[in-house]
Structures are given as C-alpha cells and as structure tokens.
Curated annotation (Swiss-Prot):
Transmembrane segments: none
Descriptive protein name: Hemoglobin subunit beta-2
Species, as recorded: Chalinolobus morio (Chocolate-wattled bat)
Organism taxonomic ancestry: Eukaryota, Metazoa, Chordata, Craniata, Vertebrata
Modified residue annotations for Phosphothreonine: 124
Residues of the Globin domain: 3-147
Length: 147
C-alpha cells in the first residue's frame, strides 16, 4: 500500500493519462540497461545490448518496457493493494528469474527521470514527489516475495 494524498493521486493519475506507454516504457527500460549495465544479465534473449544505441533501438527492450509500464499502470488502479496487484510478478521475479529486488527501485527512479524528460514543466517537484512515492511503493510490492 502506498499512501498518497488526494492531491498526489490526482497529480499521478492526471499525468499518467498522458503517458505514451510504448515510448516511455521502452525508454525507461532502455535507460535502466544502459545506466546500470549489470541489469542486462536478465535479458540475454533480447539480442544486441552491446552499446547505448543498440539498447535504445532494441525492439525487445521497447516491447518489454511497454509491458512493464502497463503493469505499473495496473498498480495505479489498485493503490490500496499494491502487494496483491504485484504478487504474481513478485513471485516470478523472485523464484524464477532471481532478480535483485534493488533493480525495482532503480527502474522506478529511471522512470521518474524519463517522465521528467517527457513532461518538462508539467513534471513539477510535487508531481515528482508523488511519482517517487508511487515508484517506491511499486518496488516494495514487487520485492514482497523476497521477504
């Protein structure tokens, strides 16, 4: 569960309605893989990830980024039950994929950077604070199975 004020919920849902999940998702995952290259080990089947250009242009990275953002959007619809919403994904990432749960926090932070880049002046400090809070809530829910 993430505790957002009414104002924070309005800011997050209002901006999220304008997010192009194809574009933002691919960019967020791509940036994660470039900025934190050790995360690439979970994406061996994605082909060429040898440099920033290859990563950012990789169709599989873009498709998976879209999938990730769609899941994030589901979390927005279920703010009072993030653990339940992400229970199956938490289990998958913990038991089968063995993803370090810190990567969820890193991805959330990268997502905030990408949103700031895309929305500029509309991504005010209060909007950023609300998204940081939400991203941490999602990361915590995804890490739940690890505890």
């Amino acid at each position: 569960m993430v505790h957002l004020t009414g104002e924070e919920k309005a800011a997050v849902t209002g901006l999220w309605g304008k997010v192009n999940v194809d574009e933002v998702g691919g960019e967020a995952l791509g940036r994660l893989l470039v900025v934190y290259p050790w995360t690439q080990r979970f994406f061996d089947s994605f082909g060429d990830l040898s440099n920033a250009g290859a990563v950012m242009g990789n169709a599989k990275v873009k498709a998976h980024g879209k999938k990730v953002l769609n899941a994030f959007g589901e979390g927005l619809k279920n703010l009072d039950n993030l653990k339940g919403t992400f229970a199956k994904l938490s289990e998958l990432h913990c038991d089968k994929l063995h993803v370090d749960p810190e990567n969820f926090r890193l991805l959330g932070n990268v997502l905030v950077v990408v949103l700031a880049r895309h929305f500029g002046k509309d991504f005010t400090p209060p909007v950023q604070a609300a998204f940081q809070k939400l991203a941490l809530g999602v990361a915590t829910a995804l890490a739940h199975k690890y505890h």
